[in-house]
Amino acid sequence: MSNILQNIFIDYYEHILYELHPRQTEIENISKMIHCGDPSYGGAFFACPDCGELNFVPFRCNSRFCPSCGNMYNQKRSFHMSCKLVNCVHRHCVFTIPEELRIYFLNDRSLLNCLFHSVRDVVLRMFHKQNKAELFTPGFILVLHTFGRDLKWNPHIHALISEGGAGNHTVWRPCTHFDFRFLRNSFRKVLLDQLTNKIGKSFCKVKNEMYSKHAEGFYVRAKPNHCKPDVTIKYISRYLGRPVIATSRIDTYDGDNVTFHYTRHEDNQTITECIPALDFIKRLIVHIPEKHFKMLRYYGIYAKHHKQESKLHKCISSEKHRYLCKFYNWQNMILLTFGYDPLKCPKCGKSMFAFEVYYKKTALFEQYRKVMGYG
């Protein structure tokens, strides 16, 4: 049974191909999402050893653009993120860019790497300058969101930063003071310098305008939010791993127009928009990342082994990690996401086993082309 998002894309699939001229990665993700759960694309037969009941479970698309599979992916990703966290307070910071710069990142998506590199350099510098002998290194996770609540193109970085760092000699030093002025000015300088190196001299005029218009730096939200470890883990699952839009935010679709709602940042008012379906699709697909592009990245002590790592206490111990990993298998993820146990016999309730697996028939050349990466 298809969801409302699948229905919208199925109805407008030809319009997408011939009017919007989507990127290759957009076509691939849209096609996967449309056929997610389609039995004709393969699946597995499960049999009950007691009553002989057969149950067919279709394959899922595993696309992050799909609301169902994207939710499963985010649950797994949130779990692995939480296993890396040191047992300390973390601060949620948001690094934004002026509206005038957004078009550059839309026209050349490789520039999105500059956002990650700029935030990384600024955060590490803020900690390193506290003590040049110790070079305190925090643990931080950066997540790129290219969308605002209204679904329009608005690339920005969400950072989850430990309020403390590991030094060359000191195991851990707390750091509760984040220098707002340093963050704003340094982020502006580093990002504009990187963009100038990538784009060239043609960007110099824009760079000078940015310094004039944003004399106090680019906006960085870094207020203390008292994210204790247990709150941090819940926060990661709820916010950092969220999809572009949840199906619960889509109110109606009448075949021509889509009505959806969101909560406006400025005043927390619920805003309802009704726009043509094709415009709604355009707002969504622009946020599909290029293939193999990492939207989430680990830095500092979370990126690699640090000499003090063995002495640091994690939010989730290694024993608990091994235990919880058992619950993140295919069966339990289906149960958590879709609300049913695919291996439970619908008649007698006993556990079923895999009986046979079916795959969609494809030409040998198509399989070869996919493996070799042609086309």
Tell what function each PLM region has.
Residues M1-G375:
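Beta->alpha loop/short-helix hinge microenvironment recognizer with preference
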